[in-house]
Amino acid sequence: DLELRQCLPCGPGGKGRCFGPSICCGDELGCFVGTAEALRCQEENYLPSPCQSGQKPCGSGGRCAAAGICCNDESCVTEPECREGAGLPRRA
């Protein structure tokens, strides 16, 4: 199993992470889908190694992207499992 790197940072102040070519999410930011904040994420298409963002798996092949939001590389859905305190590891 390949060690996956974190996907590229994106969004205001680089506080988000890319989840797909047009999806940028962060705990404090929520998710940007198809907006200017997510443009940088298209660069992932040119990088040879796979990446993964988010902590906890959710939905169909997605990962928790922000509070109450689950994203895969194509779309995001609301997901109660991804809310703060719903088994997410706490960051100090």
Curated annotation (Swiss-Prot):
Family matches, as InterPro entries: Neurhyp_horm, Neurhyp_horm_dom_sf
Cell location: Secreted
Gene Ontology molecular function: neurohypophyseal hormone activity; neuropeptide hormone activity; V1A vasopressin receptor binding
UniProt keyword annotation of Secreted present: yes
Gene3D superfamilies: Neurohypophysial hormone domain
Disulfide bonds, paired cysteine numbers: C7-C51, C10-C24, C18-C41, C25-C31, C58-C70, C64-C82, C71-C76
Domain of life: Eukaryota
UniProt keyword Secreted present: yes
SMART domains with a match to the protein in the record: NH
Entry-linked SUPFAM superfamilies: Neurophysin II (SSF49606)
GO cellular component: extracellular space; secretory granule
Protein keywords: Disulfide bond, Secreted
Chain's role: Neurophysin 2 specifically binds the midbrain peptide hormone vasopressin.
Similarity-based family: Belongs to the vasopressin/oxytocin family.
Name this polypeptide is given: Neurophysin 2
Organism encoding this protein: Equus caballus
